[in-house]
Amino acid sequence: MNYDKIKRSGILFLLGIGAITSLSCNDNDNGGYPERVPTRLSVMPLPERVDYKESVVTLPQNVTVSQNIPVSTSQLLKSTLEEKLSLSASDASNDHAFIQVQQESDLAKEAYRLTVTKEGACIYYSTETGLLWGIQTLRQALEQANFFTSGNSKYLPMVDIKDAPKYDWRGFHIDVVRHMFTVDYLKKVIDCLSFYKINKLHLHLTDDQGWRIEVKK
């Protein structure tokens, strides 16, 4: 099992679907922007509701991220912006950030809402888990923006996404009894699972009373 292959396959699948839906639209369908500008997004798992506004927003060269986002979660966004899109990312007050957040107590525990308008993106959430899932959806959208470019510009479709997991338990199983994996590898797998909103990792540790250890000689 190879973590990079897992994530690369997922991203290529998303981009392939996005390319098919986007390139099927002509200039008249997307407001005169180049054909490769995305008018649709491919998100895994499929959100409950996606409403497109039939327009796009240009990503700024310096994307400001709300200071209200927890540091570890904010770093996920910044790594995508800097490493995947070659854009700079910096912190800003929530009211002045391109990527904003808004806590709403009436949303379910893991629910979120993501809106993309001409002013930027905003994630609505009630818990940090819901915020994380909203961030992961935005990261998937941003990675597709890297594929759809015109000159030096990168675009996101204006959209309103409302989503909540259908199942509380969304698991992934790894058999570490018969196969040896490093701790670093398992951490990468966890990052990949989070990217696709999988919230349980089942480590199959032993088949009997003994604990196996790797013997290389």
Where are these regions (language model features)?
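Bacterial N-terminal signal peptides that target proteins for export
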Residues: 2-11
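Short strand-loop junctions, especially beta-strand C-caps/beta-turns
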Residues: 62, 68, 175-177, 206
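Aromatic- and acidic-residue-enriched carbohydrate-binding clefts of CAZyme catalytic domains
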Residues: 165, 209-217
